[in-house]
Amino acid sequence: MAKLSPRDIKRKIQGIKNTKRITNAMKVVSAAKLRKAQELVYASRPYSEKLYELVGHLAAHVDTEDNPLFDVREERNVDVILVTADRGLAGAFNSNVIRTAENLIREKEEKGVKVSLILVGRKGFQYFTKRGYNVIKGYDEVFRKTVNFNVAKEVAEIVKERFLNGETDRVYLINNEMVTRASYKPQVRVFLPFEAQEKEVEELGTYEFEVSEEEFFDYIVNLYLNYQVYRAMVESNAAEHFARMIAMDNATKNAEDLIRQWTLVFNKARQEAITTELIDITNAVEALKAQ
């Protein structure tokens, strides 16, 4: 490798400084988006839990054995809903959840189960379509401004219809989820068949239904399924901003380290250049004296 001149080193340092400004700006933006996304996460969780609790209450009143959404079947065909990000520059955020999905797919295929994918987020869609996986539907640009509930509803409807029609025997939902305010990890859940823990009748109080209990129960179950996909997208969105904030913070710190290292190299090169010039001047003076 050719030795760099002080001018080249200075140009390199300036390039690193420019990169540092970009990564620092991205960190600040991600931190601001993270605060809003976390507010949505912690607002959505109680609603989701109450919906699940309500389904459990109602399950004590209706015969779930006759509801096809509760039908547990032998796995021959499986659908996987995978939520990833639309963008990169978020560390291992996308690769970890994609690896989790691949492990599940491999496990099922080794047992002779056919796996179909519904992919929410550009990164997952690009990854699995390029590798020839069986992709039923893919969505991108779903996290551009806010989490799109219509996409969540459509995804839930697709897998619900496939389950009811017998095209799939089980549906899994995979996404990154915030574990604490400062950590996240991939989660795998069974989306269908639906499982609800029946609540004791004593806890229920009295319900008066304007429609049949079965109709109301079906409505609440469908609402819950829609919201589960939405919540997975909300959790993933918050985790993405957190991952990007950390990645950009690390990139900024690495840039600072590089600037310090190259500054030392620059100072050394400049000192060597000055020393060389002084030696040349001294030699020239001595040569003149010799004449």
UniProtKB/Swiss-Prot annotation:
Membrane topology: Peripheral membrane protein
A GO CC term assigned to this protein in UniProt: proton-transporting ATP synthase complex
Gene3D superfamilies documented for this protein: 3.40.1380.10, ATP synthase, gamma subunit, helix hairpin domain (1.10.287.80)
Xref: Pfam families: ATP-synt (PF00231)
Compartment(s) where it occurs, according to its Swiss-Prot or TrEMBL record: Cell inner membrane
Similarity comment: Belongs to the ATPase gamma chain family.
Protein name: ATP synthase gamma chain
Gene that this sequence comes from: atpG
